[in-house]
């Protein structure tokens, strides 16, 4: 937990473990992906308002609300199954792979150990591959109508890449087992409601 005010950290303490096995304690240098949290906290309140206004029924299908899904395998997924992670959606799609030039197939993007190749320190135990090259056609260092999506300081993504993300989700396979498997892909789609 980190609390900061006016740029000054007033509290910073780690609690718990990385897994339920309690074998590795968390540290202040651990890196977390909070994108999933952001998708949920920005989407669920909107869905709740729509539900309270009787404009949204969790028993209806994704295709009912999103016509783009009508011809896909996502058409008949119920909102309830998507919200409870029982729709069979993939747990994760690495969208960033399409944003980078091809790496040597023996190299990964990240490593837990520093080396000549993994020399870009992200956290205490996380290093990025220095050979990563972003595709010029997808990024700009200047904001514009064509590049409005802020990714990082002085780095903007093409507006139409969001369509690529949506199409990748639409075309993704479903698991045949309808059991709990965390996936935030439905939250990407809920933003279109």
Q: Whereabouts are the PLM-identified features?
A:
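Short hydrophobic alpha-helical segments used for membrane anchoring or interfacial signaling
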Residues: 1-6
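Short hydrophobic alpha-helix segments
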Residues: 13-15
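Gly/Ser/Thr-rich helix-start
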Residues: 17, 89, 187
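Active-site-proximal loop and beta-strand segments within enzyme catalytic domains
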Residues: 20-182
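Well-ordered alpha-helical segments within folded domains of soluble proteins
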Residues: 42-44, 186-191
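Short, intrinsically disordered, charge-balanced linker/junction segments flanking boundaries
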Residues: 173-175, 189-193
């Amino acid at each position: 937990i980190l609390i900061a005010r006016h740029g000054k950290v007033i509290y910073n303490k780690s609690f718990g473990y990385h897994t339920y096995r309690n074998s590795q304690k968390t540290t202040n240098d651990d890196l977390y992906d909070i994108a999933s949290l952001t998708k949920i906290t920005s989407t669920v309140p909107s869905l709740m308002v729509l539900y309270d206004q009787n404009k949204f029924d969790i028993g209806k299908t994704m295709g009912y609300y999103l016509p783009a899904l009508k011809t896909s395998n996502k058409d008949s997924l119920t909102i309830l199954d998507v919200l409870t992670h029982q729709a069979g959606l993939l747990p994760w799609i690495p969208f960033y792979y399409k944003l980078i030039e091809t790496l040597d197939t023996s190299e990964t993007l990240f490593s837990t150990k520093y080396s000549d190749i993994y020399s870009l320190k992200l956290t205490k135990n996380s290093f990025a591959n220095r050979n990563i090259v972003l595709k010029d056609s997808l990024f700009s260092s200047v904001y514009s109508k064509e590049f409005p999506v802020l990714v990082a300081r002085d780095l903007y993504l093409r507006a139409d890449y969001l369509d690529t993300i949506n199409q990748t989700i639409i075309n993704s396979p479903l698991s045949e087992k309808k059991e709990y498997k965390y996936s935030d892909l439905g939250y990407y789609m809920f933003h279109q409601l």
